[in-house]
Swiss-Prot record:
It comes from Homo sapiens (Human). This is Lysozyme-like protein 1. Residues 20-148 form the C-type lysozyme domain. Monomer. It catalyses: Hydrolysis of (1->4)-beta-linkages between N-acetylmuramic acid and N-acetyl-D-glucosamine residues in a peptidoglycan and between N-acetyl-D-glucosamine residues in chitodextrins. The active site is at E54, D71. It holds the Pfam family Lys. The gene is LYZL1. The keyword Lipid biosynthesis does not apply. Keywords: Disulfide bond, Glycoprotein, Glycosidase, Hydrolase, Secreted, Signal. Residues 1-19 form the signal peptide. Glycans are attached at N58. The keyword Hydrolase applies. It is found in: Secreted.
Length: 148
């Protein structure tokens, strides 16, 4: 686990992109405006909690996995299945370049995350969500934020 954290840090440094780390309430507003609250039955708290445990709200987070694939961005979306890194064996189900998932504009990341939830029938794709968010009271995640 420590190695994954170091690789994430290295990935952030290598990208050359300026990292943006959102606040919980700013993400709550963005996610709410994007229609994530209760998308496929998952409350806004689920999305905020998941993003925290996947990336620490860091838009440029990257984690290199043992199989050589890379998880990208605020939702840590994997290059093998969901985005295009330039390799021929990648599936690219979201029809998006992986580089589009590590920008401060979260539009492509949100569209892809919605697709993942829809196609995989839930949020089990994200290990951070399964370990820290699933089945818990997540009302605290949007507490104090100006969202309905």
């Amino acid at each position: 686990m420590k190695a994954a954290g170091i690789l994430t840090l290295i990935g952030c440094l290598v990208t050359g992109a300026e990292s943006k780390i959102y606040t919980r309430c700013k993400l709550a507003k963005i996610f709410s405006r994007a229609g994530l609250d209760n998308y496929w039955g998952f409350s806004l708290g689920n999305w905020i909690c998941m993003a925290y445990y996947e990336s620490g709200y860091n838009t440029t987070a990257q984690t290199v996995l043992d199989d050589g694939s890379i998880d990208y961005g605020i939702f840590q979306i994997n290059s093998f299945a969901w985005c295009r890194r330039g390799k021929l064996k990648e599936n690219n189900h979201c029809h998006v370049a992986c580089s589009a998932l590590i920008t401060d504009d979260l539009t492509d990341a949100i569209i892809c995350a919605r697709k993942i939830v829809k196609e995989t029938q839930g949020m089990n794709y994200w290990q951070g969500w399964k370990k820290h968010c699933e089945g818990r009271d997540l009302s605290e995640w949007k507490k104090g934020c100006e969202v309905s």
